[in-house]
Amino acid sequence: QIVLTQSPAIMSASPGQKVTMTCSASSSVSYMHWYQQKSGTSPKRWIYDTSKLASGVPARFSGSGSATSYSLTITSMQAEDAATYYCQQWSSNPLTFGAGTKLELKR
């Protein structure tokens, strides 16, 4: 099974700051997908097929990467972006998730 390692586990960013989090796969995958989860709510699909934004996701978000190295970037952190972000692969069975990166707002 492919193990996804997310880094950092926890991070904080001030409003307007650029944010980058990474997801490393133990074997090469074709695409990476990202989910956003806020406390007490179900995860929302956020970025799919590495770089495509799900409906309603602000353009300040982007995804990139290939093979074993992927990233999610926010060009300008906003308060509503504080959440936990999970990467996911389904290139190889079983489908697997990373442990998440918790993004906190620094005031």
UniProtKB/Swiss-Prot annotation:
Protein purpose:
Anti-2-phenyl oxazolone (PHOX) Antibody.
Q: Annotated region Framework-3: where?
A: 56-87
* Segments for region (Framework-1): 1-23
List all disulphide bridges recorded for this chain. 23-87
User: Where do the segments described as Framework-2 lie?
Assistant: 34-48
Extract the ranges annotated as region (Complementarity-determining-2).
49-55
Complementarity-determining-1: annotated segments: 24-33
Protein's name in the database? Ig kappa chain V-VI region NQ2-17.4.1
